Structures are given as structure tokens and as C-alpha cells.
Swiss-Prot record:
It is found in: Cell inner membrane. It is a multi-pass membrane protein. Pfam families: ACR_tran. InterPro entries: AcrB_DN_DC_subdom, Acrflvin-R, Multidrug-R_MdtB. Induction: The mdtABC operon is transcriptionally activated by BaeR. PANTHER family: MULTIDRUG RESISTANCE PROTEIN MDTB, PTHR32063. This is Multidrug resistance protein MdtB.
Length: 1040
């Protein structure tokens, strides 16, 4: 065996170079572990970073918003407010519904939060109304998170009440049991019930009241324990015909006797099978339907949950009659899969481009195969670690691997290029591999750890943004570490076995032409570098100018939070005048649906009218517009939204608010628009004074569009002003008045019908077909203490007033949300600043506090920490480089390349019309790690030349620049081509990936051009500074 000199021992690579079989098997093990890990990894749109969120819904039919707030919401809020780990509590109290949304700290497990919520509900039970039909129901779901799947159930042969009954008992319950499903809601409100519509004139003529009827019905329909008989030899269970099951049985119920003749319920009321709530409706396109929305639990994997639903659906639909049709109207996983597939394609494209650039520079197939093996091996091996860390295959981890393509090849290129140089000088391949790998080992370690140091601050980003990019940063760091291992083990071993002088000297026409081209480029660079070194102060002024320019660009570039994605689904809110009835709103909704369905980009539409846990008032409707796949429509979602709003503007009396659904949901409320700003006060009066003024001013700002608020205080109220003295004289209490009104107009649930499969309600109300509006109040009768019947009008006056349609709280205090969008020619940063400036001009009183919510609040938080994040990345890199070089000066030389990357990235973003958002900022941070590689490769060789060959600093850096020009250019182009597919992406989810690619490509181009000249000059200036400093210290010591 050839004896090698000490300088050629190969360092940490020697063992692997000398043991090719062991090295090969080790790499095979990494490959197999990565393949197994890839198959085991779940797929999702983004890392699971949801806040633990629980929604508590309480329904109290007939209750006003004020009653819901004071009697239901407030007692629950007081108990919930004592829970530990609660981050934010918001509530919405509307007519008959209270919805409380509890958002917990990211560190609190959802199951623990669930236990605390259940305990709080139990503690509040005694404080809630005694006639509450059902206790509060909680769901582990974020109401602002769009459904993962929407299904429409229709039938041409069956009434909707029967359809809902079957869907609820046979389909919804089974889907709710699937792991990951948080809530299954049935919109349409056609739950079966027996409806008793009292004829007010008939019961008045007979001297009866609605309370008499209610008492008779509740007493006639019971379902309670009756006991059993235990004899000497037999035990007998007692049962009775105490349950009435059908409308016909209730129709025959005797409610009173008059002159010894029975009065049956059918004599004074219309009794029929109907819906429990007649003021709810849902439509699929233009057809009335039961719409099933499936929402996931926070943290659940959306793909696996949707797959489980899809697998179960055929079995569930088989249990339904043939006339019932179940249609999947939307499935968010379709776009998620398409987005992930596009990102995977861009990853493969990046690998192909990187390998192509390697061949272009090396012009040798064996030399190209080596990094061609190292790149996929490093990426595939990363999957094994991702499984161990419980990560997923999502857009961000795939973006990390795509960017890593340009990173991981750098190490292999540097090793191959250095070993090839020694082989071309006449060294044997084995000796060249040992010598080249040993010489470059420290550079590889420096490159690796300085790059990972850049990613460290990402791990310490706070709140949801930090959680979001944790997987991105760690995935990229793991790929870089595996790349370093491969480059110090497999790559030199393959070089020793596959490269030779003959293979490197073997040239074809392309090789010779490209060699001449590179020689000319290097020669031109050498001439330019010599001139630059002769004019250092001019070059230094250019470097300082880039620093100043980067600061100016940072200040003036439009800033955003997260790119608006086109996921093919639009959420909409339809708003009508505040006094609109259910019938009126349903008619308007159908008019709007006709307009929307005419748009060529729209595939289907679901809409919902009525008050329940998702819709706050009768004058609003919820819509979900499902667009055709991206390749089947001409326009992206923002243009479709603009076109739809223009078309719906022609429908009189309605306002339509639309926003595209996003993979990242930070809000906890379903909002009309993408962004929210809240005003909070201690009383509703303060809000009623200032909210309209602020909204009016904000609507005039060009930086905002679709400005509206959820403050609706013009809801019509018929105020029953009871003369308490007169009522007391007649023996009539306020409870009697409330009961009479509730019986007549509250769709009161007065009894329950129990069956083997479900429970159904008996609904009591007055038949108001012949006495619409306020005239119906004249039919109300009450019973006095002597048994007489007293008209309500004799003891009360009816006053028409205005009152809020809903009352919203944030952390137990009244709040109003102002919603807004941002026009195309402005950024979120512009909008936020405009709102803050307008707020200052109003001089709001001190008892009103304002705050941005949802993604706008996250934007402010992320923007505030961005500068510190970049500073932390620079400091971390300085510390690592200082430790590696045992120098305070050389790390500064290396870091001097950073402003050029910032200028290039910011200029590219501005030229492309992109905002400086979180994704683009991540790209800039990655650029900090990339561009310093050029300086590291130059400085490493310059220091070695000074130390080992005795060169002067100028000659050393000049030779280092020429010697390392080709690998510097190669690695930069590899990183650039790795980011190029992201910059040019046009498929599903491209909006998320493009800012990262644009920033990195722009930064790499500018930094490549400038750092080749500025780094040598700064190196020499700092070298002179170091010599001057040493001489000063030496002089002081001599004088001392």
C-alpha cells in the first residue's frame, strides 16, 4: 500500500475512503431508512400549528340577544375565564344562540383543555335558565377553520325532515366517530318535530290560554321510570302508554272540558309533522338540501381524516333510500394534494437542474454521478429523521428540501472540485482523495455549521409563526447535516474509485468549448479583480452603498403577513337590511345564488340562512363557493372574487363579502373579510357612539376595501311595556307574561318524543298567518287570579324600538369587529398604518381599546420580531465563525457579503410585485447562510496560502479568488437553480412558494456579482487593520 504523507491523511474522511464496502452499506442504510420514512410520513398542507380551540354552543329558541348574553353567555364566560392556559375568549350572543370560542395557549394539550371546559360547564349549570332545552355543547373545533369536506344530501321523493333524520342518525354520527373529526354540522334545520300552531281566536273564544295548552301537552307526554313488581316467583316491569309519537295522537289529545264536552288539541290548533325550526334553510346550488359540513379537530391531519371519510361514505350511503342523493361538493384535500404534488415536481425539477449545472461545470460523467448520488441521498435520508420528529410532508417541508437541493450539492461540489484538482496535477486518485478531502474538511464543517447557525433563530420564533417554520428549519438543517456527512464519507470514497486522470482529461467538443469559455471568464475575472484591488476605497464605497440601499428598500417595500392562496374555495357572507325576515332573506339568497352560478369559474355553491351556531342573525347568510380546478378556469381566485362582487352589486338590498379560504387559519371567528380590527369597551353605548364614526372614516381610505363592522343596533324590537300595578291587581306576574309570549312566538320546545334511535321535539307557537307582524300581539291572552282571561293589551303597551341583533364579547367585555380587505395596489402594512393613523385622528376615549385580530395581529407580531430575527441570525453566524476561525476579524469579512443578498432579494420582490411577507423573510434569512459560502471558500484558501506558502495577503486572496472561482460559481448557480422552480411555479399553492424563490434568486444573482469583488477588498482592509492594531499594541508594550 502506498505510504501517504501526514498532510494527505484525509482527516475524518480517511476511514471511509479506505473502507468502501462499509461506506456503501452505511449509505444504503440511510437510503432505506429514508424510503421507509417517506412512506410513513403523513401529508398535509402546512405543519400542524393550530391553537387548541374549543367552541361552546348553547341554543335557547326565542331568546333575544340581550337575554342570551345575560342569562347564558355571561355565566358561562365567568366560569371559562377562570381556566388556566386560556389565551383568548370570544363570544357571540344572537337571537336564540350563544357561541363561545375558547382559544388556548399552544403549549396546552387539547385533551386537557377539553377537561377544563367540561368542568366549567358543569360549574355554570345551576346559573343557566331552568327551561334551557339542551345544556351547552362543546366541540373541539375552530369555527373559523373552513370545513375539510362539504356534502349535500337531497331527495326528490322525501321531505327534508325525513332526509335530515336519516342523515343525522345514519351518516353524521358515524362520521363524527372518525379520528380527527371535530364537528359535523347539519345546515338546513329540517330536524323532524311535531308542530302545534295554536289558533289564538279559537282558544280565546273557549276561555283558554296558550299556557293551558302547554301544561296539558307536557302532562300528557312523559317518559319516566315506573318501577317494577317483585313477586314470589316472577318480577314484572311496569310500563304505560305515556308517550305520544305522532301528530295524529297529539291532535286527539284532550286539553280541557267545557260543558262536559272534551276540547281536543285539534279543535284549537293545527298539529302537523314539520321541522323543529322553521327559520332555517340550506341550499346546494339551487336545490334545497341538508348540507353537512365536516370540520377537523385542531391538530388533526386533514388528509388522513378526509381519506377516512371517503372510505366510509359508500357504506353509509348504501343504508339510505335510493331517492336520497349524497354529493361531495367540496373536499379541501383535493387542492392540498395538488399543491403537494406540484411542490414535489418542483423538487424533482430542482434536482435535475442542479445535476445539469454540475455536468456543465465538471464536463465529466463520473464526476457528475458523484454529486448526483449525494443530492438525493441527503434528501431521502432526511425523511427518516422527519418521521422520528413527527413531521409531515407538507408545502413547507417540501420547500425546505427544494431549497436544500442547492445547499446539499455545494458540499459535494467543493470536495469533488478539490480532489479533481489534485488528480489533474498528477496525483493518484486515492492519494488525491485523501489529500483533497483532508484539505477541504474544515471548510465543509465551517460551511455546514455556519449555515445551520442561520436557522437557529427560526426555532425561537414565538407564537404560531415560530411553530409554523419549526419543521421548515429543522428539515433544512437535517438535510444540510446529512449532506455534510455524505460529502465527507461517500463523496471522497467515490472520487477515489471513479475519478482518474484519463476520465478527467477525456474531452469532447462540448467539453473543450465550455473549458475555453470558463478559462476566458476566469481570465476576465482576474483582470477585473486586479483593478478592483488597486482601487479598494471605491469598492468599499460600493459595499457601503449596498448596505444603505438594503436599509432603504427594507423601509419602503410593501409588507404583508402570509401570501393569499388560491385553494379553490371562497367563503361568503351575504348581508341584508337589519329588519329582514327569514322569508325575505331566503328570497334574496336565491337571487344571489342565481348570479353566482352563472360565473364560468364556479363549480358549485352551498348557502345557508337562519340563526344557529354558525350564522348570527336572520339578515345574514353564509355561502361557500367552490371553484373549478385551477387548470379548468382562466382566472385566479382574487379576480373571480372581484367579478362576483361586481355581478352581485346589481342585486338590490344586499351586500356580499367574499374571501378565499386559506390553509393557515389564525382567526377564531368567521369574518366577512380577511382582516379584522376590534374596538372593545366596558359598555355598548360607547361602541354605538364611536364605531360608526370610525367605520365611516375607514371606508374613505384607499388602502382599505370592503370595510364593514358587525355592529348592528337597528334590529326591530317590539317592547312590551307592562303596567306592573295593573298586572299585580289581576294576579298576573311577569313570568306569566313571558310564558305567554314565549308560547306564542318562541317556537317553544315544550315536550320530547323518545324513540329507539333519536329524540324529537314538540314545538308550540301561535298560527300567525292571518295576523302578521305586531298585530299578532293583540291575540295574546293571560289568566288572572280568579280564572278569567285577560288580553295582553289591557295591561301592556307595545313600543317599537331598536336593539342590537347580536352582542359580541372579547374576554368578557363588549367588542365590535371591523372587517376589511386590502386592494391589489396596497399591502397589509399600508392598511395597518392607515388604520392606526385614522384612529389617532379620532381621539377615542380611554375606555375604548383597539386591537388587530387574527392574521393582522400575527402580522404585527411577526413584523416586530423580523429585524431581531435577522440580527439574531447574523450574531449566531458570527459566533460560530469566530469559534471556527479563532478570530474576531475574519467572521466580519465573511458577514460583509450579507447586504448584497438583501439588496438583491428586496429588489427582486419589488420588481415582481411581491410583498415582503413571512415567506420572503425566511428566504432572506436563508440567503444569509448561502452568500457567506463564497467568502468562506475564498478566505479559507487565502489563509492556507499565507500560512503554508508564505504568500502576502494580497497575492493569497487574489489566488484564492481565481482558484475558487469555479466552485463558487458552481455552488451559487446550484442554489439559484434549486430556487428557480419555486420562483416560476404556477400550480396550486404557487402563491405560497413563489416569494421564497423570488427572494433567493434575486439575492443570489446580485450577491454573486458583487461579493466576488467586495470580499477580497474587505479581506485586505481588515488584514491591514489587524496589522495596525497589533503594531499599536506592540508600541504601547515597548513604551511601558
Amino acid at each position: 500500500m502506498q505510504v501517504l504523507p501526514p498532510s494527505s491523511t484525509g482527516g475524518p474522511s480517511r476511514l471511509f475512503i479506505m473502507r468502501p464496502v462499509a461506506t456503501t452499506l452505511l449509505m444504503v442504510a440511510i437510503l432505506l431508512a429514508g424510503i421507509i420514512g417517506y412512506r410513513a410520513l403523513p401529508v398535509s398542507a402546512l405543519p400542524e400549528v393550530d391553537y387548541p380551540t374549543i367552541q361552546v354552543v348553547t341554543l335557547y329558541p326565542g331568546a333575544s340577544p340581550d337575554v342570551m348574553t345575560s342569562a347564558v353567555t355571561a355565566p358561562l364566560e365567568r366560569q371559562f375565564g377562570q381556566m388556566s392556559g386560556l389565551k383568548q375568549m370570544s363570544s357571540q350572543s344572537s337571537g336564540g344562540a350563544s357561541v363561545i370560542t375558547l382559544q388556548f395557549q399552544l403549549t396546552l394539550p387539547l385533551d386537557v383543555a377539553e377537561q377544563e371546559v367540561q368542568a366549567a360547564i358543569n360549574a355554570a349549570t345551576n346559573l343557566l335558565p331552568s327551561d334551557l332545552p339542551n345544556p351547552p355543547v362543546y366541540s373541539k373545533v375552530n369555527p373559523a377553520d373552513p370545513p375539510i369536506m362539504t356534502l349535500a344530501v337531497t331527495s326528490t321523493a322525501m321531505p327534508m325532515t325525513q332526509v335530515e333524520d336519516m342523515v343525522e342518525t345514519r351518516v353524521a354520527q358515524k362520521i363524527s366517530q372518525i379520528s380527527g373529526v371535530g364537528l359535523v354540522t347539519l345546515s338546513g334545520g329540517q330536524r323532524p318535530a311535531v308542530r302545534v300552531k295554536l289558533n289564538a281566536q279559537a282558544i280565546a273564544a273557549l276561555g283558554l290560554t296558550s299556557e293551558t295548552v302547554r301544561t296539558a301537552i307536557t302532562g300528557a307526554n312523559v317518559n319516566s321510570a315506573k318501577g317494577s313488581l317483585d313477586g314470589p316467583s316472577r318480577a314484572v316491569t311496569l310500563s304505560a302508554n305515556d308517550q305520544m309519537q305522532s301528530a295524529e295522537e297529539y291532535r286527539q289529545l284532550i286539553i280541557a272540558y267545557q260543558n262536559s264536552a272534551p276540547i281536543r288539541l285539534g279543535d284549537v290548533a293545527t298539529v302537523e309533522q314539520g321541522a323543529e325550526n322553521s327559520w332555517l334553510g340550506a341550499w346546494a346550488n339551487k336545490e334545497q338540501a341538508i348540507v353537512m359540513n365536516v370540520q377537523r379537530q385542531p391538530g388533526a391531519n386533514i388528509i388522513s381524516t378526509a381519506d377516512s371519510i371517503r372510505q366510509m361514505l359508500p357504506q353509509l350511503t348504501e343504508s339510505l333510500p335510493k331517492s336520497v342523493k349524497v354529493t361531495v361538493l367540496s373536499d379541501r384535500t383535493t387542492n392540498i394534494r395538488a399543491s403537494v404534488d406540484d411542490t414535489q415536481f418542483e423538487l424533482m425539477m430542482a434536482i435535475a437542474l442542479v445535476v445539469m449545472i454540475i455536468y456543465l461545470f465538471l464536463r465529466n460523467i463520473p464526476a457528475t454521478i458523484i454529486p448526483g448520488v449525494a443530492v438525493p441521498l441527503s434528501l431521502i435520508g432526511t425523511f427518516a429523521v422527519m418521521v422520528f420528529l413527527d413531521f409531515s410532508i407538507n408545502n413547507l417541508t417540501l420547500m425546505a428540501l427544494t431549497i436544500a437541493t442547492g445547499f446539499v450539492v455545494d458540499d459535494a461540489i467543493v470536495v469533488i472540485e478539490n480532489i479533481s484538482r489534485y488528480i489533474e496535477k498528477g496525483e493518484k486518485p486515492l492519494a488525491a482523495a485523501l489529500k483533497g478531502a483532508g484539505e477541504i474538511g474544515f471548510t465543509i464543517i465551517s460551511l455546514t455549521f455556519s449555515l445551520i447557525a442561520v436557522l437557529i433563530p427560526l426555532l425561537f420564533m414565538g407564537d404560531i409563526v415560530g411553530r409554523l417554520f419549526r419543521e421548515f428549519a429543522i428539515t433544512l438543517a437535517v438535510a444540510i447535516l446529512i449532506s455534510a456527512v455524505v460529502s465527507l464519507t461517500l463523496t471522497p470514497m467515490m472520487c477515489a474509485r471513479m475519478l482518474s486522470q484519463e476520465s478527467l482529461r477525456k474531452q469532447n467538443r462540448f467539453s473543450r468549448a465550455s473549458e475555453k469559455m470558463f478559462d476566458r471568464i476566469i481570465a476576465a475575472y482576474g483582470r477585473g479583480l486586479a483593478k478592483v484591488l488597486n482601487h479598494p476605497w471605491l469598492t468599499l464605497s460600493v459595499a457601503l452603498s449596498t448596505l444603505l440601499l438594503s436599509v432603504l428598500l427594507w423601509v419602503f417595500i410593501p409588507k404583508g403577513f402570509f401570501p393569499v392562496q388560491d385553494n379553490g374555495i371562497i367563503q361568503g357572507t351575504l348581508q341584508a337590511p337589519q329588519s329582514s325576515s327569514f322569508t325575505n332573506m331566503a328570497q334574496r339568497q336565491r337571487q344571489v345564488a342565481d348570479v353566482i352560478l352563472q360565473d364560468p369559474a364556479v363549480q358549485s355553491l352551498t348557502s345557508f340562512v337562519g340563526v344557529d351556531g354558525t350564522n348570527p342573525s336572520l339578515n345574514s347568510a353564509r355561502l361557500q363557493i367552490n371553484l373549478k380546478p385551477l387548470d379548468e378556469r382562466d382566472d385566479r381566485v382574487q379576480k373571480v372574487i372581484a367579478r362576483l362582487q361586481t355581478a352581485v352589486d346589481k342585486v338590490p338590498g344586499v351586500d356580499l363579502f367574499l374571501q378565499p379560504t386559506q390553509d393557515l387559519t389564525i382567526d377564531t371567528q368567521v369574518s366577512r373579510t380577511q382582516y379584522q380590527f376590534t374596538l372593545q369597551a366596558t359598555s355598548l353605548d360607547a361602541l354605538s357612539t364611536w364605531v360608526p364614526q370610525l367605520v365611516e372614516k375607514l371606508q374613505q381610505l384607499p388602502q382599505l376595501s370592503d370595510v364593514s363592522s358587525d355592529w348592528q343596533d337597528k334590529g326591530l324590537v317590539a317592547y312590551v311595556n307592562v303596567d306592573r300595578d295593573s298586572a299585580s291587581r289581576l294576579g298576573i306576574s311577569m313570568a306569566d307574561v313571558d310564558n305567554a309570549l314565549y308560547n306564542a312566538f318562541g317556537q317553544r320546545l315544550i315536550s320530547t318524543i323518545y324513540t329507539q334511535a333519536n329524540q324529537y321535539r314538540v314545538v308550540l307557537e301561535h298560527n300567525t298567518e292571518n295576523t302578521p307582524g305586531l298585530a299578532a300581539l293583540d291575540t295574546i291572552r293571560l289568566t288572572s287570579s280568579d280564572g278569567g282571561v285577560v288580553p295582553l293589551s289591557s295591561i301592556a303597551k307595545i313600543e317599537q324600538r331598536f336593539a342590537p341583533l347580536s352582542i359580541n364579547h372579547l374576554d368578557q367585555f363588549p367588542v365590535t369587529t371591523i372587517s376589511f380587505n386590502v386592494p391589489d395596489n396596497y399591502s397589509l402594512g399600508d392598511a395597518v398604518q392607515a388604520i392606526m393613523d385614522t384612529e389617532k385622528t379620532l381621539n377615542l376615549p380611554v375606555d375604548i381599546t383597539t386591537q388587530f385580530q387574527g392574521s393582522t395581529l400575527a402580522f404585527q407580531s411577526a413584523l416586530g420580531s423580523t429585524v431581531w430575527l435577522i440580527v439574531a441570525a447574523v450574531v449566531a453566524m458570527y459566533i460560530v465563525l469566530g469559534i471556527l476561525y479563532e478570530s474576531f476579524i475574519h467572521p466580519i469579512t465573511i458577514l460583509s457579503t450579507l447586504p448584497t443578498a438583501g439588496v438583491g432579494a428586496l429588489l427582486a420582490l419589488m420588481i415582481a410585485g411581491s410583498e415582503l411577507d413571512v415567506i420572503a423573510i425566511i428566504g432572506i434569512i436563508l440567503l444569509i447562510g448561502i452568500v457567506k459560502k463564497n467568502a468562506i471558500m475564498m478566505i479559507d484558501f487565502a489563509l492556507a496560502a499565507e500560512r503554508e506558502q508564505g504568500m502576502s495577503p494580497r497575492d493569497a486572496i487574489y489566488q484564492a479568488c481565481l482558484l475558487r472561482f469555479r466552485p463558487i460559481l458552481m455552488t451559487t448557480l446550484a442554489a439559484l437553480l434549486g430556487a428557480l422552480p419555486l420562483m416560476l411555479s404556477t400550480g396550486v399553492g404557487a402563491e405560497l412558494r413563489r416569494p421564497l424563490g423570488i427572494g433567493m434568486v434575486g439575492g443570489l444573482i446580485v450577491s454573486q456579482v458583487l461579493t466576488l469583488f467586495t470580499t477580497p477588498v474587505i479581506y485586505l482592509l481588515f488584514d491591514r487593520l489587524a496589522l495596525w492594531t497589533k503594531s499599536r499594541f506592540a508600541r504601547h508594550e515597548e513604551e511601558a
